[in-house]
Swiss-Prot record:
This is Uncharacterized protein F23B12.7. PANTHER family: CCAAT-BINDING FACTOR-RELATED, CCAAT_ENHANCER-BINDING PROTEIN ZETA. Residues 18-27, 798-808 have a biased composition (Basic and acidic residues). Residues 1-27, 47-79, 580-615, 797-953 are annotated as: Disordered. Belongs to the CBF/MAK21 family. It comes from the Eukaryota. It comes from Caenorhabditis elegans.
Length: 953
């Protein structure tokens, strides 16, 4: 049987692929989109580990588990090759270069209001398309980096997914710096970490996000634009039909939209963090908010509202910290001040706002800096101040902490405000505060009244009455500078010489009972005022004028009657009544005054004080009285207190003041000389400045800060020789004329120590005998003459720097009955008793008077005064006491140098002090000879060692 051969069927030849070059544009774009979609799907499966080779094991284990990126089988290799092919064909849409900003290549086209806007569904569809393009581009960038950089990029991405928290944050920050457009996922993760309660990583995450947003993501000169406001209808026109460009535009617009949402979430997260109890985290959040507000304009209303609301935080440190932050913002961006004022105004008049929020808000407003261009801003501030002021005063509260701050802010804004006098039509409430509140509130109130009256080209007599009456109150040390500045400005502008003389008399009365720094400042003020007003006005009266006619009449009456009777006579000898008007002219003058009052009342406008109103608080139109009236220290109106014929006996008391500088200043006024002092008396003559010299330490270097707070307490900066340590060689080598009067006894003492030290070293004597020239007994006697106090008072002085420690000899020395020396185990300095001695004369006025009377009866003091006069003539030839040029409360500065030191008025007190020490040395030397020439070191002198206590006999 023959088998038939079957014809072999040849396999059909595969059809040749249609070349892509022959495809149209639409087909090419569709093919690319399909390829990219499949590549994205493959890449997602590959990255998630959904592709497995062992299907049986996968079925047994159930859900797929992520595996390492190892192309173990041909299937995975084919997928990767296909993805690489697609990547090579299409490429990354956004190729960001480090150092450039993404908004530099952004297409900033917004929707035109004239054109019709797309509906919400169309906008959402385009937004989703842009998000898809953004996610796909981020995946392509990750694949490309792994191809180009290899193991380094793979390691970086593995750290982001599997590393520690710190390493993750660092790797994310690097990726966000490299390409912000492809890093929104990392920003979202960091914000989510900040939202977790109780996390300690917030303090580290916040600076990273702050850096990314400010330096890499947010535009500098514009806000972020949401997707809905873009020119979506013009998308085809903007891309010119190019699908790749169209996709890139959608990607960038969607990125900016998502970035705006994430930034707002970041700000809201910071606001929530402020409510947490951790102070460090709160301050870090507030600082970040302030930096974002200063650096970028995005979400400034939300940030500013959060900062202003922080004024009312339960922790008072947070409110104070917020004030500092807002001050920095206002300095860097002055244009934002009006926005800040509006936000604070909403806070100030909001219901249920605590007092602390008002306090910090007004503190910030009161420290703003203004110029002539800020008239509208100042008017807005004045309206806020006066509204709160009326609210507080309406409750009859005079000790409110908010009042001084409001008045201080009003004083700063008033000169720059336009038509500010109309805002302050009724000054009755301000006068109420000036009369019934403490100095902390009264001084700003009086300053505001002075500015108000000065703007109206006159100063009301009512203001002078209030200021004159306020001087009787005890002024605290913190208000010294404000009071002196107000007094100087007021007396400089006053046209009534008689009233200025009355104020000078009152200031001298205050100076007698004040601390040395305030007393010296008052004397300097009087000297400067005398120089400004000229020599024609006599501000200081040293002798009392007696009317010759009154002397004759009094002599005649004293001859007839045994009893003395005092009457006031004018130049012609007519008797004057108590109010200073002749009896026969009294009725006629009263009639004239009443007629003038009727005419003035017609001229005065209601609600405003006029310069011509003689019936109210302006009494200058009545005219000066032509007769001498007795000085009345309790009179209310300084205009009618005639102090021109009353001698300033206070200067005699001040010339014997225990503080050398005060004594010489007073003597300069008595001799009609100008007080030459350019330093800061309120700082240089304080008790602490005096005690700091005994501490023998150099002052701390004060770092000068620029661009800091507007209102800041000025740090004390010693000038001239006061900067030198009293134990240094540079200090002891200074001449006597170069040393301030209140330090000459220290200079003499330390100089003598240096000389004795050299002599003792040459002779080989003990070091503890260096203080032989001045013993504790001499200091006790000297202090007793200036400040006699209670016996058995103890005070500590640390002389360890000069004498060193010599413990072996302490037990060998015996105590003497004159001085009881107690050696302390430590070197702590206790100067409480010395403090009491310095303050004793200021606390007990009666005791001071007694001391001054004793000085008048002391013959040695009288001789010393004669010697002081001789020394004063020599001192005038040496030049002024110069030093560092520093402005004082009077607005001028001292331009002299250290070489010109020597002609200051207060040098005489130091000479007197040194001469008294010499007299005491001679007396002590005589006593030492009688006792057999004992060493003073063993009789209570200054030994080597730490702090020593000296008991007075």
């Amino acid at each position: 049987m023959k088998l038939k051969k079957r014809p072999m069927k040849l396999a059909a030849k595969p059809k040749p692929k249609q070349p892509t070059e022959k495809l149209g544009k639409a087909q090419k774009m569709k093919l690319k989109e399909d390829n990219l979609a499949s590549a994205e799907k493959i890449m997602a499966q590959f990255e998630s580990g959904a592709v497995h080779t062992n299907k049986k094991k996968q079925a047994q284990n159930g859900a797929a588990k992520p595996v390492a990126h190892k192309p173990a089988n041909p299937e995975n290799s084919n997928q990767k090759r296909q993805f690489k092919k697609i990547l090579g064909q299409d490429g990354i849409l956004v190729k960001h270069q480090e150092g450039t900003k993404w908004y530099s290549y952004q297409i900033d086209h917004v929707h035109d209001e004239k054109t019709e806007k797309m509906n919400a569904s169309e906008i959402q569809k385009l937004l989703e398309e842009g998000k898809d393009e953004m996610a796909q581009d981020a995946a392509l960038l990750q694949t490309k980096e792994k191809q180009d950089n290899g193991s380094e990029a793979s390691w970086l991405y593995s750290v982001i997914s599997k590393g520690t928290a710190t390493d993750k944050r660092t790797a994310m920050q690097l990726q966000m710096h490299k390409s912000p457009v492809h890093s929104l996922e990392y920003i979202e993760k960091l914000i989510a970490s900040c939202k977790k309660q109780g996390t300690r990583d917030v303090v580290d995450i916040i600076p990273i996000l702050e850096d990314v947003f400010i330096n890499h993501c947010l535009p500098e000169n514009r806000k972020l634009i949401p997707f809905s406001k873009r020119a979506l209808r013009e998308l085809t026109e903007l891309s010119s039909g190019n699908q790749r460009l169209r996709r890139k535009i959608l990607l960038m617009w969607a990125f900016e939209h998502e970035l705006k949402i994430l930034y707002q979430q970041f700000i809201e997260t910071l606001v929530e963090i402020i409510k947490r109890p951790l102070e460090e985290v709160i301050k870090r959040s507030l600082k970040t908010l302030a930096n974002c507000l200063m650096g970028r304009p995005e979400s400034e209303n939300l940030i500013l509202s959060a900062l202003v609301n922080a004024f009312g935080h339960p922790n008072y440190k947070i409110g104070a910290f917020t004030v500092v932050l807002l001050e920095g913002i206002s300095r860097k961006h002055p244009a934002m001040r009006i926005v800040m004022v509006e936000e604070i105004e909403r806070l100030a008049f909001r219901k249920n706002v605590n007092e602390r929020a008002h306090l910090y808000a007004m503190t910030f407003l009161s420290q703003m800096k203004f110029s002539k261009k800020d008239s509208d801003l100042c008017c807005r501030l004045m309206s806020i101040y006066l509204s709160l002021f009326k609210t507080i005063v309406g409750k009859k509260i005079t000790d409110n902490r908010l009042l001084p701050i409001i008045l201080a802010g009003a004083n700063r804004a008033f000169p720059f405000a336009k038509d500010a006098d109309k805002l302050l039509e009724d000054v009755k409430d301000v006068y109420f505060l000036a009369h019934n509140s403490n100095y902390r509130t009264a001084i700003p109130a009086l300053k505001l009244l002075f500015q108000f009256h000065k703007m109206n080209d006159y100063v009301s007599d009512r203001f002078y009455n209030a200021l004159y009456r306020k001087l009787l109150d005890n002024c605290p040390a913190g208000a010294y500078a404000q009071l002196l500045k107000l007094m100087f400005d007021t007396m400089k502008e006053d046209s009534s010489a008689q009233r200025v003389r009355t104020f000078v008399k009152r200031l001298l009365q205050v100076a007698v009972n004040s601390q040395p720094d305030f007393t010296a400042s008052i004397l300097i003020l009087i000297s400067r005022l005398q120089k400004l007003r000229g020599t024609t006005e006599k501000l200081v009266v040293l002798s009392k004028d007696i009317d010759p006619a009154a002397r004759v009449v009094a002599q005649m009456q004293n001859d007839e009657d045994d009893e003395e009777r005092y009457v006031d006579l004018d130049v012609e000898g007519n008797e004057i009544s108590r109010n200073g008007v002749k009896k026969e002219e009294k009725e006629e003058e009263d009639i004239v005054i009443e007629e003038n009052e009727d005419e003035d009342k017609k001229k005065v406008q209601p609600g405003k004080l006029g310069a011509s109103s003689s019936g109210g608080w302006v009494h200058r139109s009545i005219g000066a009285r032509g007769a001498k009236t007795p000085y009345d220290s309790v009179a209310r109106n300084p205009l009618f207190v005639d102090a021109s014929h009353t001698a300033d006996s206070e200067l005699l008391l001040l010339s014997k003041h225990y503080h050398p500088s005060v004594a010489v200043f007073a003597k300069a006024l008595m001799e009609g000389r100008e007080i030459n002092y350019g330093g800061e008396a309120l700082n240089d003559f304080t008790l602490m400045a005096f005690l700091d010299r005994f501490a023998f330490r150099n002052p701390k270097d004060v770092t000068k800060t620029t661009g800091t707070r507007i209102v800041r307490k000025k740090a004390h900066d010693p000038w001239g020789v006061r900067k030198l340590a009293v134990g240094s060689n540079e200090y002891t080598q200074k001449r006597r004329e170069e040393i301030p009067a209140d330090e000459r006894f220290l200079h003499r003492y330390t100089s003598s120590l240096q000389k004795e030290k050299k002599v003792k070293k040459e002779n080989g004597d003990d070091d503890w005998e260096y203080a032989e020239s001045v013993s504790s007994a001499e200091f006790d006697q000297l202090l007793e003459r200036f400040e006699p106090g209670e016996l058995n008072e103890e005070f500590d002085i640390d002389y360890s720097k000069e004498f060193g420690a010599e413990k072996s000899k302490r037990n060998k020395k015996k105590d003497v009955e004159e001085d009881d020396v107690d050696m302390d185990e430590d070197d702590d300095i206790d100067l409480n008793d010395l403090n009491e001695e310095e303050d004793g004369g200021m606390e007990d006025d009666d005791e001071d008077d007694g001391d001054m009377d004793d000085d008048d009866e002391d013959d040695e003091d009288a001789e010393d005064d004669d010697e002081v006069d001789d020394d004063d003539e020599d001192d005038d030839e040496d030049g002024g006491f110069g030093g560092k040029s520093s402005a004082n409360i009077f607005g001028d500065a001292d331009e002299s140098s250290d070489e010109e030191i020597g002609a200051n008025d207060y040098e005489m007190a130091g000479d007197k002090f040194a001469e008294m020490l010499e007299d005491l040395e001679e007396d002590d030397g005589k006593r030492g000879k009688k006792k057999g020439g004992k060493k003073r070191g063993s009789t209570g002198g200054f030994k080597r060692g730490g702090a020593k206590k000296f008991r007075k006999r």
